[in-house]
């Protein structure tokens, strides 16, 4: 006769894998060399923190982008978005994008934070902040960083609709103007 080890009677909820457990967040990665700050979090995003991280006496321009949850998608009422990620890969991809942008545009700072879990209507799911010596480089860098994050980073979005339906989507199914990309033009 074999005995089974005693089961923990105090927990009836199965434990989540660490990458899905909000209590293991925020996950961050930084680079002092290029003043890069990256974060994946289940908490509300704070644009003031983003600007504090990218602030530099050598910067004449600071660009801040907030991506927020819309209330409709293709005519369907959206109740909320939900994001998931595999943090080790996502942070590595974010660092690659941020480092490349810092070097290409001579940035003084880069901050990227992406929210995971449920993101209600009107709340931010992504914050991108960059600082540069001049506005032209900052504008270009901010847009390029955002588009590369949407195209390359291991973060997936589930749109949840008021009618009860839901759809998983890649972050990069549409261009900056909202036009649908074909599978050969973009996406993972």
UniProtKB/Swiss-Prot annotation:
Record pathway: Cofactor biosynthesis; molybdopterin biosynthesis
Transmembrane segment boundaries: none
Domain of life: Eukaryota
EC number from the UniProt entry: 2.8.1.12
Species this chain originates from: Neosartorya fischeri (strain ATCC 1020 / DSM 3700 / CBS 544.65 / FGSC A1164 / JCM 1740 / NRRL 181 / WB 181) (Aspergillus fischerianus)
Region of interest: Disordered: 1-23
GO process terms (BP): Mo-molybdopterin cofactor biosynthetic process
Compartments (UniProt record): Cytoplasm
Protein's job: Catalytic subunit of the molybdopterin synthase complex, a complex that catalyzes the conversion of precursor Z into molybdopterin. Acts by mediating the incorporation of 2 sulfur atoms from thiocarboxylated MOCS2A into precursor Z to generate a dithiolene group.
Protein name, UniProt field: Molybdopterin synthase catalytic subunit
Gene Ontology CC: molybdopterin synthase complex
Biased amino acid composition, Low complexity: 1-14
């Amino acid at each position: 006769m074999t005995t089974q080890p005693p089961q923990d009677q105090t927990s009836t909820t199965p434990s989540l894998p660490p990458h899905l457990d909000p209590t293991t967040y925020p996950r961050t990665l930084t680079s002092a060399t290029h003043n890069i700050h990256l974060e994946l979090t289940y908490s509300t995003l704070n644009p003031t923190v983003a600007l504090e991280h990218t602030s530099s006496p050598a910067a004449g321009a600071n660009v801040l982008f907030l991506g927020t949850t819309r209330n409709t998608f293709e005519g369907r009422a959206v109740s909320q978005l939900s994001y998931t990620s595999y943090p080790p890969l996502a942070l590595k991809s974010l660092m690659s994008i941020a480092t490349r942008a810092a070097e290409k545009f001579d940035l003084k700072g880069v901050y990227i934070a992406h929210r995971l879990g449920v993101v209600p209507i009107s709340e931010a799911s992504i914050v991108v902040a960059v600082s540069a010596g001049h506005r032209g480089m900052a504008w270009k860098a901010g847009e390029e960083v955002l588009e590369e994050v949407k195209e390359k980073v291991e973060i997936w979005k589930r749109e949840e609709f008021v009618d009860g339906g839901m759809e998983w989507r890649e972050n990069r199914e549409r261009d900056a103007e909202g036009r649908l990309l074909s599978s050969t033009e973009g996406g993972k």
